[in-house]
Structure formats: C-alpha cells, structure tokens
C-alpha cells in the first residue's frame, strides 16, 4: 500500500480497456477484399452452417467476418465493407460484413429490418 507522498510522486498506472474490434483501428467501418468465403459450424449447443469470409482489410490486417442474412453473392476477390460486432457462437468472428454496399448485394425478399440487410422497400 503506497503512502500519500508516494502517490503524489508517481500516480497509479491506468489500466487500459481491451479493444473489442482492434482491426478497425477506431474507425466505424473498414473496406477489404475477401480472400476466402466458406461455412463453419457454431459451438455447442447450436448447430448450423454459418457463412463467414476471411477478409484482408485496407490496413493490411486479415480478419474473419460474418455474412448476415439468407443467401449471398460473395466470392474470392469481392470488395466488402465490414463493421464491428461479434457472433456469439462462432469463436474468433468479431466482425460483420455490411450487406448492400460495394460488391455485397442486399438480401432479396426481405420485409422487416430491411435497413440492416440492404434491402430496398418493396413496391
């Protein structure tokens, strides 16, 4: 336990908070190129084939990001925009691909939560 004089001489070291999305480097979104598009299985107790992509960002960092929504048009060399946001049942997936921007198409026949999936308003 330090004395008050010791604290005046040298203050306590600040404990820095761990960043949840370090690859974004404090930006809201980042652009990148898909290097691999594949499916993976979630951890227990869930069961599915989740669509994910390995993305090399413009800052040179390569991350795994989730492709939300039903169906997608992504393949290798597709240019995508990613945002933060993890997928709880996929270890190591801390980013989401934004639908409806750059090479990523919006989800077709989407009626609700359209803005989150880049879907236009149905006529």
UniProtKB/Swiss-Prot annotation:
CDD domains per the UniProt record, alphabetical: Ribosomal_S12 (cd03368)
Q: Which UniProt keywords apply?
A: Methylation, Ribonucleoprotein, Ribosomal protein, RNA-binding, rRNA-binding, tRNA-binding
Q: Which organism is it from?
A: Solidesulfovibrio magneticus (strain ATCC 700980 / DSM 13731 / RS-1)
Lineage, top ranks: Bacteria, Pseudomonadati, Thermodesulfobacteriota, Desulfovibrionia, Desulfovibrionales
The text of the family note is:
Belongs to the universal ribosomal protein uS12 family.
Question: Which residue stretches belong to region Disordered?
Answer: 101-123
- Composition bias (Basic residues) maps to 113-123
Looking up PANTHER family in the UniProt record yields: 30S RIBOSOMAL PROTEIN S12 FAMILY MEMBER
- Note the subunit structure: Part of the 30S ribosomal subunit. Contacts proteins S8 and S17. May interact with IF1 in the 30S initiation complex.
Q: Which GO terms describe its cellular component?
A: small ribosomal subunit
Is Transferase one of the keywords UniProt gives this record? no
Is rRNA-binding found in the keyword set? Answer: yes
Give the gene symbol: rpsL
Pfam families documented for this protein:
Ribosom_S12_S23
Among InterPro entries, the record links this protein to:
NA-bd_OB-fold (IPR012340), Ribosomal_uS12 (IPR006032), Ribosomal_uS12_bac (IPR005679)
The highest taxon in the source lineage is: Bacteria
What SUPFAM superfamilies does this protein map onto? Nucleic acid-binding proteins
The protein depicted here goes by the name Small ribosomal subunit protein uS12
Q: Where is the signal peptide?
A: none
Question: PROSITE patterns in the record, alphabetically?
Answer: RIBOSOMAL_S12 (PS00055)
Q: Which residues carry this modification: 3-methylthioaspartic acid?
A: 89
Q: GO terms for molecular function, please?
A: rRNA binding; structural constituent of ribosome; tRNA binding
Q: What does this protein do?
A: With S4 and S5 plays an important role in translational accuracy. Interacts with and stabilizes bases of the 16S rRNA that are involved in tRNA selection in the A site and with the mRNA backbone. Located at the interface of the 30S and 50S subunits, it traverses the body of the 30S subunit contacting proteins on the other side and probably holding the rRNA structure together. The combined cluster of proteins S8, S12 and S17 appears to hold together the shoulder and platform of the 30S subunit.
In the record, biological process GO terms are: translation
């Amino acid at each position: 336990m330090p004395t008050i004089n010791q604290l005046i001489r040298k203050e306590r070291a600040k404990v820095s908070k761990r960043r949840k999305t370090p690859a974004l480097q404090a930006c809201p979104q980042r652009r990148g190129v898909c290097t691999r598009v594949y499916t993976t299985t979630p951890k227990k107790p869930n069961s599915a084939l989740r669509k994910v992509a390995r993305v090399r960002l413009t800052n040179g960092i390569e991350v795994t990001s989730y492709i939300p929504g039903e169906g997608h048009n992504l393949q290798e060399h597709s240019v995508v925009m990613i945002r933060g946001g993890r997928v709880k049942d996929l270890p190591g997936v801390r980013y989401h691909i934004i639908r409806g921007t750059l090479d990523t198409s919006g989800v077709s026949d989407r009626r609700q939560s359209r803005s989150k999936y880049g879907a236009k308003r149905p006529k």
